[in-house]
């Protein structure tokens, strides 16, 4: 297992950080109260120290790969600030063990100012200001201000500012700093003494505030007691008045109870008469119920009869449709099985394929067959047909804003668009029948083929499942 040599500063191996004698450079001797000065100047310096307070500090750690700090310490108010890295933080910093360097920033504030950046240290290997001083982080150079001590797994290193670097160069450090100590230059009033003075002043102020609060509390309690006594006297008078009102109300309630007793006797006799009426109504209801059962049985018989009639009608319709299919037989053409004829008359919409007389006659047969079938099946046509043999017509009652509603079902008319629209309406009536019985439409404009499919469906008896038969249970 390889050992880390001195100077290999990894963030993951950091154990503690210590900031020595934190002072702002521009206010280096702000709290240094000289005992040789006169009493007035020392009093001014003391008031200034009390008003501005001692310096507070916290530390943030940064790495090159992250914009935000990877760790922020708690705030400390000690002159020499030591921040230890515990096991949880060490596990968190373990992910940054491959960083080449890391940055330590100190943030300072007095009691009257917000925190601001105090100093920044870049912890980099072979830095001239970062020196190894041993394995004990407790002993350090006391006279150096704004000094940084970093304790790693392989030892303790000291990082100083440029002002203290000359002093460091004049000093030779032994292998262990446990035997090394230099007395610190001390001012008339040290930071510790000023802190005690500040705390004492705060205690005195708190005592005065507490005194005024206690006095105000006692005065408030006395005032509250007087108000409470006055409220109780008013409450006693109110209770006496309420007692008199309750006595008067009690007398009224006695009179009311007497009246209610009289009313109760009257209500009792009224209920007795209503009971007799109810018994009579009950007997009448039983008679009505017997009549209802008789009517329900009669209705059931009529419903069953109606069902039988509907079934017989459906069979009769089937028989009539069979007769119609014999009167107007729709069969494949002898020469071309892909085409159908009605009574051996062809029906084609291709130009010049059949003459107008044959087409008018076949359309007239089909129109009469369709109108008769709609009457048998009790289904109204969306576009009614005016049967007149080969001069039949069809009505368009649905299309809005048209100059005429009657369209001829024979081709010998001008303009030809009227005849084409009439054929379209006739085909829509046939398709409507197919959709009613759930039959597919193979070729939307092959009228005879679709009509043949409709007749075969009705003659097979499958249309009976579409007959609307209703039954009412008693």
UniProtKB/Swiss-Prot annotation:
Gene Ontology MF terms in the entry:
SNARE binding
Coiled-coil regions listed: 271-300
Localization (cell): Cytoplasm; Golgi apparatus, trans-Golgi network membrane; Endosome membrane
In what way does this protein cross or attach to the membrane? Peripheral membrane protein
The family assignment reads:
Belongs to the VPS38 family.
What superkingdom heads the lineage?
A: Eukaryota
Q: Name one GO cellular component term.
A: endosome membrane
Sorted keywords for this record are: Coiled coil, Cytoplasm, Endosome, Golgi apparatus, Membrane, Protein transport, Transport
Organism, scientific name: Schizosaccharomyces pombe (strain 972 / ATCC 24843) (Fission yeast)
Protein name per Swiss-Prot or TrEMBL = Vacuolar protein sorting-associated protein 38
Q: What does this protein do?
A: Involved in endosome-to-Golgi retrograde transport as part of the vps34 PI3-kinase complex II. Mediates the interaction between atg6 and the pik3-ppk19 core complex, leading to the recruitment of atg6 to the membrane.
Coarse class of the protein's main subcellular location? cytoplasm
Quaternary organization: Component of the vps34 PI3-kinase complex II composed of atg6, pik3, vps15 and vps38.
Q: Which residues cross the membrane?
A: none
């Amino acid at each position: 297992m390889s050992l880390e040599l001195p100077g290999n500063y990894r963030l993951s191996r950091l154990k503690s950080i210590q900031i020595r004698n934190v002072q702002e450079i521009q206010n280096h001797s702000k709290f240094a109260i000289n005992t040789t000065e006169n009493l007035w100047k020392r009093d001014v310096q003391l008031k200034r120290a009390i008003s501005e307070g001692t310096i507070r500090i916290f530390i943030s750690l940064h790495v090159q790969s992250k914009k935000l700090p990877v760790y922020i310490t708690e705030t400390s108010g000690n002159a020499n600030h030591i921040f230890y890295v515990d096991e949880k933080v060490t596990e968190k910093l373990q992910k940054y063990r491959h960083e080449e360097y890391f940055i330590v920033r100190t943030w300072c504030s007095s009691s009257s100012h917000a925190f601001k950046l105090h100093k920044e240290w870049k912890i980099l290997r072979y830095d001239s200001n970062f020196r190894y001083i041993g394995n004990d982080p407790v002993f350090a150079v006391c006279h150096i201000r704004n000094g940084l001590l970093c304790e790693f797994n392989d030892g303790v290193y000291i990082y100083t500012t440029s002002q203290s670097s000359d002093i460091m160069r004049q000093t030779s450090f032994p292998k262990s700093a446990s035997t090394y100590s230099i007395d610190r230059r001390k001012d008339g009033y040290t930071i510790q003494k000023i802190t005690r003075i500040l705390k004492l002043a705060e205690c005195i102020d708190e005592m005065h505030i507490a005194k005024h609060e206690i006095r105000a509390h006692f005065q408030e309690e006395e005032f509250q007691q007087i108000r409470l006594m006055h409220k109780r006297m008013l409450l006693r008078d109110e209770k006496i008045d309420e007692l008199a009102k309750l006595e008067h109300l009690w007398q009224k309630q006695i009179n009311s109870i007497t009246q209610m007793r009289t009313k109760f006797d009257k209500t009792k006799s009224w209920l007795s008469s209503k009971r007799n009426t109810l018994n009579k109504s009950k007997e009448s209801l039983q008679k009505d119920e017997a009549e209802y059962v008789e009517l329900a049985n009669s209705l059931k018989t009529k419903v069953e009869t109606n069902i039988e009639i509907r079934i017989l009608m459906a069979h009769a319709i089937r028989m009539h449709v069979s007769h119609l299919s014999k009167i107007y037989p729709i069969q494949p053409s002898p020469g071309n099985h892909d085409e159908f004829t009605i009574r051996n008359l062809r029906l084609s919409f291709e130009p010049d394929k059949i003459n107008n007389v044959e087409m008018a006659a076949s359309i007239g047969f089909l129109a009469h067959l369709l109108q008769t079938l709609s009457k048998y099946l009790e289904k109204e046509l969306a576009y009614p047909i005016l049967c007149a043999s080969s001069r039949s017509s069809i009505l368009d009652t649905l299309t809005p804003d048209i100059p005429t509603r009657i369209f001829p079902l024979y081709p010998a008319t001008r303009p030809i668009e009227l005849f084409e629209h009439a054929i379209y309406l006739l085909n829509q009536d046939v398709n409507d029948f197919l959709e009613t019985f759930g039959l597919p439409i193979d070729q939307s404009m092959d009228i005879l083929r679709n009509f043949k499919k409709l007749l075969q469906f009705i003659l097979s008896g499958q249309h009976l499942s579409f007959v609307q038969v209703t039954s009412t249970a008693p």
